[in-house]
């Protein structure tokens, strides 16, 4: 196994599900690195350590993705799978064979942008679909290929990961949805893509003992879309991701963390 998992996780009741999945994850990944928010309590950190996971707190939380990638690189595995852990738990639970196949593809590419199938995208609230469609339209146009960037799952070779760490700031946060692919494309890395059904909407799984079914997803999406604040948040987040990606489009590449990326 030559893949290390680099994941971020803001825990919302998924620990028991993660524990059940660890035999699969140990077979798929040479090591598992997980960053959690600074507020995460010591008991949970000890649970992760007992599972063999390298867990670390990220403070501020916006540095979580960078710190996960940074820690994963130290294992010097050939490839790294970055994933939002709540999405990965659902994926491994509901479609393990698909995920295993994606990891095979991941090992053939310097950069793999894993997107959502139309079926997976349709499970998300309209607020997410509409705002993320704008993000994808901007960067699909600029990078000259269809891309689904905010799906929370990407693959990198060791070389690509080190390239990103040298050219991004830890505080990029969710802006890395765009900054990472943009910087890699500008650096001459080819962006491979594939779509997965397993990246359907994970939020309804919170505090459940198993992944939510399609009925629960649909009910949760209606409730989500009924709140104006959710639409405001999603528009603001899309703006943040686009702004970060456009900065990466013009930032100098020859110096480490040049300028003031969002």
What is each stretch, according to the model?
Residues 7-28, 40:
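Short, well-formed alpha-helical segments that are part of the catalytic scaffolds
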Residues 35-44:
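A conserved acidic beta->alpha catalytic loop
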Residues 49-63:
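Conserved donor nucleotide-binding strand/loop of the catalytic core
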Residues 66-79:
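Active-site nucleotide-sugar/metal-binding loop of Leloir-type enzymes
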Residues 108-151, 160:
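Short, flexible, basic/aromatic active-site loop/helix in glycosyltransferases
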């Amino acid at each position: 196994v030559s893949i290390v998992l680099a994941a971020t996780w803001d825990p919302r009741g998924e620990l028991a599900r993660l524990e059940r999945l660890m035999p699969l994850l140990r077979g798929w990944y040479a090591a598992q690195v997980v960053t959690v928010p600074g507020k995460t309590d010591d008991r949970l950190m000890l649970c992760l350590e007992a599972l063999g996971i390298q867990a670390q707190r990220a403070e501020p939380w916006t540095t979580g993705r960078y710190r996960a990638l940074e820690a994963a690189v130290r294992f010097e595995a050939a490839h790294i799978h970055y994933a939002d852990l709540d999405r990965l738990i659902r994926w491994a639970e509901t479609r393990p064979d698909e995920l295993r196949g994606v990891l095979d593809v991941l090992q053939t590419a310097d950069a793999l942008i894993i997107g959502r199938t139309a079926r997976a995208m349709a499970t998300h609230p309209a607020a997410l679909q509409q705002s993320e469609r704008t993000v994808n339209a901007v960067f699909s146009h600029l990078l000259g290929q269809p891309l689904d960037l905010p799906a929370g799952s990407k693959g990198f070779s060791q070389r690509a990961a080190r390239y990103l760490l040298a050219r991004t700031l830890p505080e990029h946060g969710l802006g890395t949805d765009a900054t990472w692919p943009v910087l890699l494309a500008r650096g001459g890395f080819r962006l491979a893509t594939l779509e997965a059904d397993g990246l359907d909407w994970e939020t309804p799984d919170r505090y459940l003992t198993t992944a939510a079914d399609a009925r629960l997803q649909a009910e949760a999406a209606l409730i989500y879309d009924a709140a104006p604040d959710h639409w405001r948040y999603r528009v603001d987040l899309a703006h943040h991701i686009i702004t970060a990606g456009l900065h990466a489009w013009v930032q100098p590449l020859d110096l480490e963390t040049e300028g003031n990326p969002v």
